[in-house]
Swiss-Prot record:
One of its GO terms (molecular function) is single-stranded DNA binding. One of its GO terms (biological process) is DNA transport. Coiled coil: none annotated. Keywords: DNA-binding, Host cell membrane, Host cytoplasm, Host membrane, Host nucleus, Host-virus interaction, Membrane, Transport, Viral movement protein. Residues 150-187 are annotated as: Interaction with Arabidopsis thaliana NSI protein. A motif (Nuclear localization signal) lies at residues 81-96. A motif (Bipartite nuclear localization signal) lies at residues 21-42. Binds to single-stranded and double-stranded viral DNA. Interacts with the host nuclear shuttle interacting (NSI) protein. This interaction may allow NSP to recruit NSI monomers to the viral genome and thus regulate nuclear export of viral genome by NSP. Pfam families: Gemini_coat. It is a peripheral membrane protein. This is Nuclear shuttle protein. It is found in: Host nucleus; Host cytoplasm; Host cell membrane. Belongs to the begomovirus nuclear shuttle protein family.
Amino acid sequence: MYSTKYRRGFLANQGRGYPRHSTGKRSRNVSRIDFKRRSSKYVHGNDDSKMANQRIHENQFGPEFVMVHNTAISTFITFPSLGKTEPSRSRSYIKLKRLRFKGTVKIERVHVDLSMDGPSPKIEGVFSLVVVVDRQPHLSPTGCLHTFDELFGARIHSHGNLAVSSALKDRFYIRHVFKRVISVEKDSTMIDLEGMTSFTNRRFNCWSAFKDFDRQACNGVYGNISKNAILVYYCWMSDIVSKASTFVSFDLDYVG
């Protein structure tokens, strides 16, 4: 379990962000660290020939990834640790190739007044999953990631085209948006999630770098990334008292 300052799954509600307890399950491959101390500065030269194409898998689910209506969650993709057991990395940098995700979101009505007469109204709302690149990763003074509202202006903006707030455009950019408009008469429904985005192409290479100052902490958590972290934002907007529970698998292809 990571320390509090690297905790993920922050819930945005009524314009504020609150750190949630780290009880959510995040299944991923963990590599043992075995290395010589390296400088955090990197130069991509002939030494890169020792780097290999790899893939790291991560599941995001559990209590941390359950949202009540009109709330959002901010989290990050875990990068590989420095080590020899794949998936891992051999340098203080990796080349990001592509990110694939696949999973489900379950939308459920929350019954708050059992004495209501007549049929229940439809569950209507908008679910969004947004992949964002953070060019200069660093935690805020509160130890939290930027909330959905801070990054995009307001959660209601998920009904239209999302855009990064002008004050943060130099640091963040949107890489992929998955959005579903939901309208069902049932008390619950399941929606499939699937998508892919590329970071490197024939014209452009996207590199992520790591601090790796402490030999006991050469891992892939947000707090150890110094360049190009990948953030994920979930948002469920609805006028109906309800909740959204997500289970999403991420596969990150990289050269490391």
